[in-house]
Amino acid sequence: MGKINIKWVVCTILLVGLSTLESNAQQRWFRTSSLEFGLIGGFSHYSGDLTRTHFESRSFKPSVGLITRYTPGQLVTFRLSAQYGQVEGRDDWYEDKADPERRNLSFKSDLWDFTAAAEFNFNQLDFRDKSGVIPYAFIGVSVFKFNPKAQFIYDPSSPVAQYLGQPIYSQLADRDGEWVELQPLATEGQETTEFNEKKRYSLTQVAIPIGGGLKFKLNHTWTLGLEYGLRVTFTDYMDDVSSTYVDPVRLSQQYGPMSAAMADRSAVLKAETDRDGNPMYRGDPSKNDLYGIFGATLTYRLYGNRPKCPTF
């Protein structure tokens, strides 16, 4: 019996194993890896205390970014993306402006999203094909940056102006129409003397991206994709709204009159507690905020590699 060539045995096993993953087993060689770079554009949106439906069309804002994909085999693709967009929510999309009990809160924020994820391809990739459709799902981890702002409207006749007194409220006269950053104002009493245990929320947070889409191979090098990805966050403060009201005087004494003015913008000031001593809620702390991104991707494949036999 002749001597067995280990090199060719290993090579044959590799080829047989790879061919079992290929829908067309009659083809011996195929490309098994690729690196792609491209653009992603679409719309970002927010869902939280200031929206009543998850897909609130008025919250959709343009989003743009870059994406890279690396496919080491056929069924899994690893991706990195960086995107910029905006999110927004407003009570006055839903509230009757004549309602004296309306909350009248609003916000908008720039949004930076950095995501690393794994795509699971439901069709096996074969880069020899000039065209084809590949459904996929993805999950990973995202780091996002946000900074909620709201527009201050100077109104000496407002309830908060009357409550604070004109000498104090008039300090804000030259800031009418200004878009004010809300996190530094601690609008829910964070780190005040009375609520020192409530810490300010961080403007950089982590989320879990979950989504899916379709990739359309246009030719050997270009791929068009359509997808939606939900970001499950661990914060309820994307909109600066989460828990309870705080007495405006307390806020004004600790952080200035702007904090009081932006914390309660209703037509009738809300007390810290109701008649039964229960907290007056400004938001719903039991549910975290969410955001999502609808995207269209266009990527260019730089290279693909064929499997090689090991060298001994």
Show the residue positions of the predicted features.
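Structural signature of outer-membrane beta-barrel domains
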Residues: 44-48, 81, 85-89, 142-148, ...
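Short loop/turn motifs that connect adjacent beta-strands in outer-membrane beta-barrel proteins
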Residues: 25-34, 75, 124-133, 150, ...
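Predominantly the C-terminal beta-signal and adjacent terminal strand-loop region
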Residues: 219-312
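Short glycine/proline- and aromatic-enriched beta-strand/turn motifs that initiate or cap beta-hairpins
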Residues: 26-69, 289-305
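Residues on the lipid-exposed face of transmembrane beta-strands in outer-membrane beta-barrel proteins
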Residues: 39-43, 66-70, 116-120, 139-143, ...
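Extracellular loop and loop/strand-boundary signature of outer-membrane beta-barrel proteins
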Residues: 49-55, 99-107, 195-200, 281-284
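Gram-negative (and chloroplast) outer-membrane scaffold detector with strong preference
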Residues: 76-180
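Outer-envelope beta-barrel architecture signal
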Residues: 31-37, 74-76, 112, 129-135, ...
